[in-house]
């Protein structure tokens, strides 16, 4: 019995050392089961939106959309500094810029929201202010179809066939924006107003996150 207990003790010690070794080696970068990587995976499965100020910051640092994805993937999360109470959580991340300098920034995440806001200009969750500016889709999960809706009922020519979801997805990510001032971000299931230029007009639609897509509630042309 003593021999068995001794072996179990050594096994437990070795297992614990192995876990610590893996954790410090990967530092939230390679283990999908770590809390930090679960958060980052949830972020990258949604649409990261940036306003004009954050876009200007990225331009100044010469960081592309692909660079933002890499930045998030390689960042670590400080849960002790993050504000994670309530439906919408604000996480503090530590990353590295292309020039080698460190960057402390913020990301907000709501489980029932398809949109994630990023703030490269602040590092304290208490200082984070939701922008009322126009938000541009910057980083998103690569899939052909991000939208679901009753296309035949909207009455917009060119968006009635089976190709409507893919067509709208392409237009939104290449030319569209989210009108953040009209978004209801405090609800249990946030809804957003999306603007998409199309053939000299602007299509306005509202939608919410459902089964990893944007469920379209309304879709119409913008009135003058």
PLM region spans:
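Ribonuclease/tRNase effector modules and their secretory precursors
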Residues: 1-56, 60-224
């Amino acid at each position: 019995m003593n021999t068995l207990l001794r072996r179990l003790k050594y096994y437990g010690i070795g297992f614990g050392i192995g876990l610590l070794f893996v954790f410090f080696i990967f530092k939230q970068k390679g283990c999908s089961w770590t809390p930090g990587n679960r958060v980052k995976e949830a972020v990258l499965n949604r649409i990261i939106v940036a306003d004009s100020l954050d876009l200007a910051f990225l331009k100044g640092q010469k960081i592309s959309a692909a660079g933002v994805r890499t930045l998030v993937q390689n960042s670590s999360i400080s849960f002790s500094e993050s504000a994670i109470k309530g439906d919408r959580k604000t996480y503090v991340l530590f990353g590295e810029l292309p020039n080698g300098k460190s960057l402390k920034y913020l990301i907000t995440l709501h489980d029932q929201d398809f949109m994630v806001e990023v703030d490269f200009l602040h590092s304290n969750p208490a200082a984070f202010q939701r922008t009322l500016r126009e938000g541009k889709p910057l980083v998103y999960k690569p899939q052909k179809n991000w939208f679901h809706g009753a296309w035949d009922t909207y009455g917009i020519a060119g968006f009635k066939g089976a190709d409507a979801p893919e067509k709208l997805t392409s237009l939104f990510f290449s030319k569209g924006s989210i009108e953040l001032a009209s978004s209801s971000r405090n609800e249990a299931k946030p809804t957003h107003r999306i603007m998409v230029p199309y053939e000299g007009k602007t299509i306005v639609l509202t939608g919410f996150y459902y089964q990893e897509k944007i469920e379209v509630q309304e879709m119409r042309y913008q009135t003058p």
